[in-house]
Amino acid sequence: MEKLRTTILNNDDVEKKIARIAFQIIEEYYEDKELLIVGISKNGFLLAGKIAKLVQRDLPKSTINLMELTINKRNPLKENVTISPNLSFGNKKVILVDDVLNSGKTLMQAASYIVSKDIKKMNTVVLVDRRHRNFPIKADWVGLTLSTTIQEHINVEILKNDISVYLE
């Protein structure tokens, strides 16, 4: 049986959401000389890259470092969290990016890892917030908040430079 698939955000919609999120980050961090943008692998990292590019364009005097955080999304406690490149977090401000916030388990585990690195401040970004929390975490900046049933699935597809969000 074929899955029903509804387009929630097309590429143009996603680009507008990313631009708005980048603008909100710029408003918050325009005075800072350095900012770490950490994307949760794989889609969160690709979104973080797009956000970092826009932030760097509008804050040319700031150093924007893009990092990829790898975590087992199905079972975050099963494997160690890794980060690349392995830059110092010490007393720095961090933006943590993921594609979808559902139960909060992955974002919570990633945030816990980053907080353990003696950072100065952290904000969280997600493209889609489903509002099905099992853990006490929130996204500071959200592209789209969507109420879904537990049985429905949000799929963020990134093909080359084209990003779309589907409800399945």
Predicted regions and their residues:
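PRPP-associated nucleotide enzymes
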Residues: M1-E168
